[in-house]
Amino acid sequence: MSNYPNFSLTSFVECLNEIEHEFLRDKLENRPVLVRKLQELRRKTPNNVASLSYDPGTIHQIHQTTHRIKVAAKAFIRIDQSFVSLHSDAVEDTSKALKKADASSPVVGCRDLSEDLPAYHMRKHFLHTLDNPYPTQEEKEGLVRLTNESTARVGLSKANRPPLEVHQLTLWFINARRRSGWSHILKKFAREDRSRMKHLVRAKLSSSNQSTPPSSTSDSLSNNLDDVLSDNLGRPLTPVDKQQFEDDWASMISWIKYGVKEKVGDWVYDLCAASKKTPKPGMPRPVTTVAKRHPARKTKPAAKPKSRTANPRASTTPSIDSTLDSSKLESTPELSMCSTADTSFSTFGSSLSMSHYNPFQDGNDILQSPTVKARGNRKVKALPKRAGKQQPDEVENGKIPFLCLSVAFV
């Protein structure tokens, strides 16, 4: 309106059109401009309305523009009111649903694991006091009270669980320091010195960009993890030492956060006991109780003396009445001569006659064979060739020594 010094219906319509256009755009930066224009229009209009000329068309146009602005303004107001109401209802309903869910099934009791709910607050305290996980008497009583209250909120499924006591919590921390590996790190990397262990834990947490527990005394020592490890080990730090410390640390944190199933079923011990010995038929299966889970040390049975039986030895001069298996004896030229000489006449008399049997009917094959099949499936090595070879005519006419002839008959 300030751009139009002479107030008229035409300038009034143009001002309303600008307000309508900027109002429908609904930009954040246009809101102060709209407020300023509306205030100026409201201030100047009552003073100049009486001096305006009568123009029904322009007046009708002013009424239409004003009506559109009014309808749009009411719509925006309803939208804002509805949004505020819906937002409030959504926040209220969500809060009620979360409270109901927390009351019926808390996060710590959603899984039926023995270490989850009862040990939740104890594990949390262990992590917060990792540099010195030795709770005071006041802290123990507070943890016991907090744990029992959490257990009572679980519901009927845990109603038969007895309340936790202070001495049980003390035993849990003793076992937790050992099972998690905290005591192992204390012994291996801190010389079993709790002050060194405290400084080592703080250096590790500081190197991992984690918050360290508050300290009552100011530490003037170095917070560099490698320097602390090297000082505790008493020698230069090696990559193997650093890797072992990192592995032990990761294993400790994993146990504290997630833990393991601390209760092993009795069936495991029964299975181990049954696999050690074979039960007799008709005997009942032994059931391993708590008292029998650690059997007494077994003593090694005395070794039975070995029976010393003399192994039969082959004699170079066996007799005819020997009962030993002759197939196990090594045949030598002397043995062959003796054995064949003893049995040659009996074999010759019971089977064939010397005049009707030619042992060399196959030519020289028998002389080329390394062994000769004798009676009783006993193999006898053939005699080695002598230095003096037999003449061909002697072999063909059967003129060979008597000993060789005996070998063929046996």
UniProtKB/Swiss-Prot annotation:
Protein name (record): Mating-type locus allele B2 protein
Entries under SUPFAM superfamilies matching the protein: Homeodomain-like (SSF46689)
Keyword Nucleus listed: yes
PROSITE patterns xrefs: HOMEOBOX_2
Similarity field: Belongs to the TALE/M-ATYP homeobox family.
InterPro entries reported for this sequence: HD, Homeodomain-like_sf, KN_HD, Ustilago_mating
Biological role: The B locus has at least 25 alleles, and any combination of two different B alleles yields a multimeric regulatory protein, that activates genes responsible for the pathogenicity and for the sexual development of the fungus within the corn plant.
GO biological process: regulation of DNA-templated transcription
Record field: compositional bias (Polar residues): 312-335
Biased composition, class Basic residues, residue ranges: 291-307, 375-388
Compartments reported by the entry: Nucleus
Organism: Mycosarcoma maydis (Corn smut fungus)
